Amino acid sequence: MSVLESKIHTGSEQFRENTEYHKGLLAELKERSAAARAGGSEKAVALHRSRGKLTARERIDALIDPGSAFLEFSTLAAFDMYGGEVPSAGIVTGIGMVEGIECVIVANDATVKGGTYFPMTVKKHLRAQEIAEQNRLPCIYLVDSGGAHLPSQAGVFPDRDHFGRIFFNQAQMSAKGIPQIAVVMGSCTAGGAYIPAMADETIIVKGNGTIFLAGPPLVKAATGEEVTAEELGGGDVHTRVSGVADHLAEDDAHALELARSIVRNLNRRRHTWLDIVEPVAPLYDPEEIYGVLPKDLRTPFDVREILARMLDGSEFHEFKSRYATTIVCGYGRIHGYPVGIVANNGVLFSESALKAAHFIQMTDQRRIPLLFLQNITGFIVGREYENRGIARDGAKMVMAVANAKVPKFTLVTGGSFGAGNYGMCGRAYSPRMLYMWPNSRISVMGGEQAADVLWTIRQEQMAREAAQAGRNPQEAMPGPAELEEQGRRFKEPVLAMYDREGSPYYSTARLWDDGILDPARSREALALSIAASLNGPLPPQEEGLSYGIFRM
């Protein structure tokens, strides 16, 4: 492979300014992430510990293999939602190595609203299960939850992708041979009782773990029977009498050791279908990415400068390097794993879309994972390009992305706007993981463009209203100065809305992505993501009616 040669001057004033700006964004990300990881209030955490419990993240640390990484999903889920009182949506999810086996871990945080399920909690739990199913990863549920957040019941209970879907997914995954393991470490009430009841194997902690469809207050109200939580659904009852649970643990630490023992006996081996080699560090320091990225998304830069700081040995076998240069395609490795890369380097023209479609088909047939680096304003617009068939050619790229069977991964490094989001494997195209950088923006179009479009429509509406009233539209319109002022006032709230909703924090709060990454650490997160995908089966090659690679 060719070695990418950086043309960035790391001693320049521009590089220094870029670095300072992006490190400021990173500091904000770290501050917000640390606050989310702290969980509930100090009082709630103290009460939790007084019961002999570990926190959700302490439980995960004790469960995974010593010294191994935990790839956490959506740390900032529900950020700035629900009055800021539900950090991480009250649940911690991610991929961790347990006894050498990658597992999806779902841990309720009982220090946050008693571990109850808000709408975003449900969405985050379901997303973790989706990742587990796509990648055939065992699920370990560390249960400590009061069930549905009752005031939010309309957004939690009745619909297809609400609380009940959790149990549906458990049943489906179990039927596919994807292990489901539950560790009941606290309350497990009402519908939540089905998490351990539907697991393949269940552990319950003595004294703290309880499983029941109706707690003592509801039992008393319904039947008049007075019973304690332990008598109704404690560990002794469920391991000795009902058989709902299989193992009784003395405390959290014992329960997590039992969980490790269960994983040890799953009889799972990964049979990789990729050509993996020993990893090599990039020739250029990944920390330099802060200086490579411009402060303004509208400022162009060569995406190869990012690749030089992300790929093993900064090696890159580029495809069609002289053709359709606003899209960069080629092969490289990340921590030894081969990847086919599709990276924006400007607006998408017809030629760019055709080149990408060709490369995506070829990479899919070679069964190499695809990595999309999104920094896209969209497809080119205008009469000339419409006449040349930009919609038809863009559709070819979208078709190739949608039908690629290999694992796909998306990293938004800048803008993610309009149909460009679709062509570059946005959330709707089922990438195994989708991450964003702190400088990224996502919306149907830029705020200024949206404001201009809406203001144009408003002016046309004003002219129609004048005509309908029998007035000359041109004479009825305000003078230039007044019209400009009206336009400014009209556009102001539109610009503010797009600025707020285009933020990566707005996106990650609503799980439009799987987390915001430190640009200099993205290489590690991508490697862990690719590694997890290898637990799944070999991507299929279609039987029957099939075609070779179309040269676009």
List where the protein language model places each region:
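Ligand-binding clefts of soluble mixed alpha/beta catalytic domains
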Residues: 1-552
